[in-house]
Structures are given as structure tokens and as C-alpha cells.
Swiss-Prot record:
InterPro entries in the record: G1P_thy_trans_l, NTP_transferase_dom, Nucleotide-diphossugar_trans
NCBIfam families, sorted: rmlA_long (TIGR01208)
Protein name according to UniProt: Low-salt glycan biosynthesis nucleotidyltransferase Agl11
GO-annotated molecular function: metal ion binding; nucleotidyltransferase activity
Protein purpose: Nucleotidyltransferase involved in N-glycan biosynthetic pathway that takes place under low-salt conditions (1.75 M instead of 3.4 M). Participates in the formation of the tetrasaccharide present at 'Asn-532' of S-layer glycoprotein Csg, consisting of a sulfated hexose, 2 hexoses and rhamnose. Involved in the addition of final rhamnose (sugar 4) of the tetrasaccharide on the dolichol phosphate carrier.
The keyword Metal-binding appears for this protein: yes
Species name: Haloferax volcanii (strain ATCC 29605 / DSM 3757 / JCM 8879 / NBRC 14742 / NCIMB 2012 / VKM B-1768 / DS2)
Length: 357
């Protein structure tokens, strides 16, 4: 079995962060979202991975993943070009996949339990496809699956007004090569895209059994700033955190802290976990780093009160103010203005931006 990892798309809902880079490289707990997907595929025994590239961020993604050897996998890069839908992206991998079954994994998704169970469920029978599902509170906003008592899919409906179930498709699929014939027969939807749900429905109509696996753990599509922050919370809550860096004697550190080897917490700083602090980061005197915060590499925080936030890296924050629920892009420089107000600020700041609060 092979893996097909989608890393295209414009990331419009994550602007301004994605004006300067692909959404799949935004870090969660100081690791790019795309790396979690590669690790999930490797955990499922998949070592041949095709990475679908769009127009944006090709070089950055290739620089991160390389040939895959750092992850114990072999990576082939496949250029999709214009984003014409998930089914179009899957179709671009036809030559790479050949006669093998494959997992298709949306590279901006992250889930607790990985894809091992999804793969094992698919391999337990004779299926044309397998889909990961999760119960949601707002099924009208998702593609929805109707399943029988054996877990076989009987119908797929895209964003129904009256959904028959609350089982939503969540961006992880397993396919046999038969899906490529289904894709070739598709017509663009009203969105002008080739829809993967239409391809799966075509397999159903052609007599293929479609497996389903209901995901019990958490899952996040990290398409918006608030989704990145929630994913950061979930990962920090579950992650095994290690302190390897330097903590000064007069610093206060409570709770679960991940402190990289070359990171420093100086005298007079307060850090309360769960928190992740990357290599080269410095938490200076008078700084409070509160729960569910990730401080990226080579960042310096001084005097600020920050919590439930992601600092992507190479940033300088020197302000006496309070920053909460914020996503701060690489190279952000935030300082104080004379009229700073005491209440917390919620910010989404793009790469290399400068602010005076």
C-alpha cells in the first residue's frame, strides 16, 4: 500500500499567515502539520508516499520533507498545479500508485489516532474504498455518509439539508486503483471541481463495497486560525513533553513543559504548561507564558503575558501587554506603544510584520 499526501490549496482562510507559505507548514506544538501526516502514514506501515504539490510552497515543502529518509519513508513529488478538487488531486497520483491500494491523506488535517485502524479495516475485506468518519454536531456543513449495520457505506451526500446521519467524512481515505476509472468519468461539480465524494459514489453505483471507520479520538482540519489554536491545545494535552533546555534558578516553571535543548527560561520568567518552547527560544525576565502556548525557534519573549497562542518562530515580542488566543507569523516583531491598554489582545499576524500595541 502507498500513501498520497495532499499539500496543495491556497490556504485562503489562514491569511495573512499563508500569504508567505503553505498552510500545511504552519506548526502545531512546534511541528508542521504536514509532518504529523507523514508520521501517521509511516506508523501504518506505508513507506512509499507521493506528495501532491500545488502552485504555492513547493520549494518549502520539498525542503522540509526532502527525500523522506529523515522519516524512514521514500517520497515522490507530484505536481497538481491548479487546485481542481480532491478527486483531481488523487487522479494526479495514478502513475505513482500503479496497481497498489493507497491512503489519501489531506495534509492540513491532524487526528489523534492516526490511520492504522482505517488501513486495517480496509484490508480486512474486499473494498473499492474506505473512508474515515466522525460524529459531528453540524452535519449540514460536511459530506455525510449513511452506513449499514456492517459499517458498509450505502450513500454519500454533500452538505445535506436533512442529513440521514451525523457521520462526516474527515479527510482520510483508502482506495483501490478502481477509483481512477471513476475519477476519469467525473464531471465538475457546481464549484467547478472534481469531487472525491462523487468518485466514491460512482464506485458504489458500480457495485464496489465501501468500508467505513468511525474515528473515536479528536480530529481537526487546521484550515483557520482558531483551528490551529485548538489543534495546538489538543496535541499539547496528549504529547509527552520533555525539558532538555536551560531553566534558571529564579524562574518559575509549573506543569508539563517541552523545552528544547538550546532553549532558555531566564530568571524572573514564569511558564505554566502545557507549553512547548523550541530550540533557540529565550523566555526573559518578566514574561508569563501560559497554558497551551507554543513558542517557535529563535524567538525572544520579554515582559509579555501570553497564553493559548502559537508563535511560529524567529519572532520578537517585547511588550508589557497581554496576548491571548493568537497566531503570530514567522519573524513577527511586537513592541509596546505608550497608550497600551491592559486587556488581552487577540491577534493573527503575518510573517515579518511589526506591531506596536
Amino acid at each position: 500500500m502507498k500513501g498520497v499526501l495532499l499539500s496543495g490549496g491556497t490556504g485562503s482562510r489562514l491569511r495573512p499567515i499563508t500569504h508567505t507559505g503553505p498552510k500545511q507548514l504552519v506548526p502545531v506544538a512546534n511541528k508542521p502539520v504536514l509532518e504529523y501526516a507523514v508520521e501517521d502514514l509511516k506508523e501504518a506501515g506505508i513507506t512509499e508516499i507521493g506528495v501532491i504539490l500545488g502552485h504555492k510552497g513547493r520549494e518549502e515543502i520539498q525542503n522540509l520533507l526532502g527525500d523522506g529518509s529523515d522519516y524512514g519513508v521514500e517520497i515522490t513529488y507530484i505536481v497538481q498545479g491548479n487546485p481542481l478538487g480532491l478527486a483531481h488531486a488523487a487522479g494526479c497520483a495514478k502513475d505513482f500508485v500503479g496497481d497498489d491500494d493507497f491512503v489519501m491523506y489531506l495534509g492540513d488535517n491532524i487526528l489523534k489516532e492516526g490511520v492504522v485502524d482505517l488501513v486495517e479495516s480496509f484490508e480486512s475485506g474486499d473494498f473499492g474504498a474506505g473512508i474515515a468518519l466522525q460524529e459531528v454536531e453540524n452535519p449540514q456543513q460536511f459530506g455525510i455518509a449513511d452506513v449499514d449495520d456492517q459499517g458498509n457505506v450505502t450513500q454519500l451526500i454533500e452538505k445535506p439539508d436533512e442529513p440521514p446521519t451525523n457521520l462526516a467524512l474527515i479527510g482520510m481515505y483508502v482506495f483501490s486503483p478502481a477509483v481512477f476509472d471513476a475519477i476519469e468519468q467525473l464531471e465538475p461539480s457546481w464549484r467547478g471541481e472534481l469531487e472525491i465524494t462523487d468518485a466514491i459514489q460512482s464506485l458504489l453505483e458500480d457495485g464496489y463495497a465501501i468500508d467505513s471507520h468511525v474515528v473515536e479520538g479528536w480530529w481537526k482540519d487546521t484550515g483557520k486560525p482558531e483551528d490551529i489554536l485548538e489543534a495546538n491545545q489538543l496535541v499539547l494535552e496528549d504529547k509527552s513533553l520533555k525539558k532538555r533546555g536551560t531553566v534558571s534558578d529564579d524562574a518559575t516553571v509549573d506543569g508539563r513543559i517541552e523545552l528544547a535543548e538550546s532553549a532558555t527560561i531566564e530568571d524572573g520568567a514564569v511558564v505554566r504548561g502545557p507549553v512547548s518552547i523550541a530550540d533557540g527560544a529565550v523566555i526573559k525576565s518578566g514574561t508569563y507564558v501560559g497554558p497551551y502556548t507554543s513558542v517557535g525557534p529563535n524567538s525572544t519573549l520579554e515582559g509579555v503575558h501570553i497564553e493559548n497562542s502559537v508563535v511560529i518562530g524567529e519572532s520578537s515580542i517585547n511588550t508589557s501587554g497581554r496576548i491571548v488566543d493568537s497566531l503570530l507569523g514567522k519573524g513577527a516583531n511586537i513592541g509596546s506603544a505608550d497608550d497600551f491598554l491592559p486587556e488581552g489582545r487577540r491577534l493573527v499576524v503575518g510573517e515579518n510584520s511589526q506591531l506596536k500595541l
